[in-house]
């Protein structure tokens, strides 16, 4: 009987010690880093669950959208988009025909296919976050233009988080590392407003969501991670994704994009249009 009581007391003491140590770690991390460990672990657990792509990007562009995009673009600019579904698609603005023969009008899925081809060629499918080059894969693009001409532009991308996980070996990140998935699906929505001059635009933050987290919880998680990883807030990443994708479509002197690159052969501007409930990205001549 005395032996059982001794074992019971030892177990209780050990349990209390573990509780005190855990509470101590929580209080220390909260005080030193401003991180709520329990809340952060809960959020990371939510995004660490396996992701069904059909749920996070139900309207993803597919192989046929590359082919139809190629047909539309090449009907105006002969030979601009090369390749096929088997070999993959390519694009180059180095050698252009003498003239853009007609306007180019693309649906959201065709826009997704075009942006993917341009980003692979001219951005090397990378996005820089906290000084690290992160592999980015476009999965879905949808946009809608309101009566005021503001376009809510949504992009779903997959980010490879390996470079960050490799550096999460020190306290307190080592406690969070196992909950960070290798891939994060990021839904980026920005508001795009056309500028007053040709080929110009302005991008504003709308919403950012990771995997199945809400936009609010995503912003809260980014605030936490920024304190130790210095990755910036959700708005910063959102605008970065938006600028890469919109830049691949419109372009400028500093970023290679379709519309601006066709200026020497007759392109006059771009537009996001909505006619009969159908949204299109248009390059005018």
Stretches with model-predicted labels:
Residues 2-285:
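Extracellular/lumenal and peripheral-membrane lipid-interaction modules
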């Amino acid at each position: 009987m005395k032996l059982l009581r001794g074992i019971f007391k030892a177990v209780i003491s050990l349990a209390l010690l573990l509780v005190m140590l855990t509470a101590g770690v929580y209080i220390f991390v909260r005080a030193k880093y401003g991180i709520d460990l329990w809340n952060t672990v809960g959020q990371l657990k939510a995004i660490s669950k396996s992701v069904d792509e059909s749920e996070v990007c139900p309207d993803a562009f597919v192989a046929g959208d590359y082919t139809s995009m190629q047909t539309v673009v090449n009907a105006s600019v002969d030979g601009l988009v090369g390749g096929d579904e088997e070999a993959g698609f390519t694009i180059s603005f180095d050698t252009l025909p003498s003239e853009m023969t007609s306007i180019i009008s693309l649906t959201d899925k065709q826009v997704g296919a075009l942006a993917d081809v341009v980003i692979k060629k001219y951005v090397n499918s990378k996005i820089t976050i906290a000084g690290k080059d992160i592999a980015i894969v476009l999965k879905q693009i949808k946009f809608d233009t309101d009566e005021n001409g503001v376009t809510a532009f949504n992009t779903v991308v997959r980010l490879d988080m390996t470079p960050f996980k490799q550096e999460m070996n020190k306290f307190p990140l080592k406690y969070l590392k196992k909950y960070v998935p290798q891939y994060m699906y990021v839904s980026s929505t920005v508001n795009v407003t056309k500028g007053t001059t040709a080929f110009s635009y302005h991008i504003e933050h709308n919403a950012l969501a990771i995997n199945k987290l809400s936009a609010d919880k995503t912003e809260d998680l980014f605030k936490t991670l920024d304190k130790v990883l210095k990755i910036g807030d959700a708005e910063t990443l959102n605008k970065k994704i938006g600028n890469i994708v919109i830049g691949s479509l419109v372009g400028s002197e500093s970023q290679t994009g379709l519309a601006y690159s066709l200026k020497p052969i007759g392109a006059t501007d771009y537009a996001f249009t909505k006619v009969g409930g159908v949204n299109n990205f248009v390059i005018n001549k």
